[in-house]
Amino acid sequence: MAIISVAHFLHDVYSSFLAPILPLLIDKLGMSYFIVGVISMVQRLPSLLNPFVGLLADRVSVRYFLIIAPALTTISMSLLGIAPSVVVLAILLFVMGISSTLFHVPGPVFIRRLAGDKIGRGMSFYMLGGELARTVGPLVILGAVSLWGLEGSYRLLPFGLFASIILYFRFHNVHLDLLQSERPAASGRIPKALWRFFLVLLALTFFRSIMKSAFTVFLPTFMKANGASLWLSGASLSLLQF
């Protein structure tokens, strides 16, 4: 579980690279705020596949989803600085969105099957990795840009790829379907009494995500446009998500 939590941390560190360097990307590619909103939406489009990935995770071994996802996210987000056009930038973000779905949806399934009777502790470490990454990520990418420039962000590639390599050697022979067979089979049906609860929860999550995404994506850009330094803008985002 510790390895998965560390992989979750590294994955989400890379996935938080966009907002802190948006002011630089806007200057480089000449993007309007509308275009920034569009590419941010493109990054989140693969989340529409969450229900289907979840259904798949309930039926097949998910270990390769978790093994591949950190590598995909690392590659796509480390190359943001050298994207030559808005189209290439959007493609990189779309790939990152797919890899994020492949990691975050099966991740809790993986934890549940490995944690045994300590599911709560397993999920707490898993979530800690993700939450901490949102604070550290902006500082990591700004440090890289300070050292190597915007187009030197690709030098962060090895660290994230290391996570996928470790996950492969640790879990490629772990057959979670066998672990699942030791538990009573669930019917897979949601009781009718819970449907209203899930619909309300879905609505709350949807509108909360809209507000949070708009704020976190544009905060560094807004601060930079109003005279703040790039470091202060990124640090404010880190503090907000701490």
Regions found by a protein language model. Name each.
Residues L18-A19, R196-S238, F242:
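Extracytoplasmic gate region of multi-pass secondary transporters
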Residues S76-G81, M96, L167-Y168:
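MFS-fold secondary transporters
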Residues L92-G129:
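Cytoplasmic helix-loop-helix junction between adjacent transmembrane helices
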Residues S40-G54, S238-F242:
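Central cavity-lining transmembrane alpha-helices of secondary-active solute carriers
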Residues L48-V87:
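Conserved MFS/SLC helix-loop-helix module at the cytosolic interface between two early adjacent transmembrane helices
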Residues F169-I190:
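Flexible cytoplasmic inter-helical loops of multi-pass small-molecule transporters
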Residues I4, V87-L93, L201:
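Short hydrophobic/alpha-helical segments at membrane-entry points of transmembrane helices
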Residues D117, Y126-H172:
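Helix-loop-helix hairpin linking two adjacent transmembrane segments in secondary transporters
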